């Protein structure tokens, strides 16, 4: 999902209700490599002959940088800017296959605010709101000079509101977090309105080693909760193990007022991972996600797997 925020979710996808201390900040880098299922040229052409404009890539890459700042103890604001690459894009239209090459560029900026409703240790609850801003290019062209469809561009051209909620609690030595984010797509480039998006699930984590003085576990969400947020007391290096179970849904897109019936889909993912937290506040996390179940409509390929890597630093 596009937007990223900061909080200690225990994993790389699920948000937590935690916020940064007032006046504290963090910066991070996140890399996501998604491998789709591979469909042959013949399969794409056959779908196109049925009126389905199907496409495939070799892989999709999202490399993003982000930062967060604690406005107050309850309110944290974060931004994330991605670089997007779609490798070896192939698309079929009216029975003809086109090799559109590699598509890459700066994507759309996401801005999120997280407001924590609860205080102190134990369970927590936070509300999340934000906006995806159309900073990405929408004018990439094929080798023949034809402008690519909006869904293949690095950017969308649309201003998309985002809203969500995050909750968390401790269960003995384990941390449990749950979150959901919804993104409303508005009209973007080339009279295209991409499908709305929903992402939500749960994360279970366990810390090995200790980090004294951190009254909350970290910061970060899509950059991963790879950074501890509090520097009041000395801390020691530690490891976290985590497992995330989450779902993703994408609605059908609309072009020039016409709904693309074969677009969109939904999937359920399982993503185990680990994170190393250094004594100096630098953290590195990685996870490998595999789809347990998916129903992707024919214009898009199924998912094979997703690898995520994140690095972050609190200050």
Predicted regions and their residues:
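Residues that define the transmembrane beta-barrel architecture of outer-membrane proteins
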Residues: 57-63, 103-109, 123, 144, ...
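Repeated loop/turn-to-beta-strand initiation elements of outer-membrane beta-barrel proteins
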Residues: 25, 75-79, 111, 120-124, ...
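Residues on the lipid-exposed face of transmembrane beta-strands in outer-membrane beta-barrel proteins
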Residues: 16, 27-31, 65-69, 79, ...
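Extracellular loop and loop/strand-boundary signature of outer-membrane beta-barrel proteins
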Residues: 14, 49-53, 94-101, 148-153, ...
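Outer membrane beta-barrel transmembrane domains
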Residues: 40-49, 192-315
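Transmembrane beta-strands of outer-membrane beta-barrel pores
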Residues: 31-37, 81-87, 117, 131-137, ...
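Long, hydrophobic/aromatic-enriched structural stretches that serve as scaffold segments
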Residues: 52-112, 116
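Surface-exposed strand-loop-strand hairpins of Gram-negative outer-membrane beta-barrel proteins
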Residues: 2-5, 32-62, 92, 151, ...
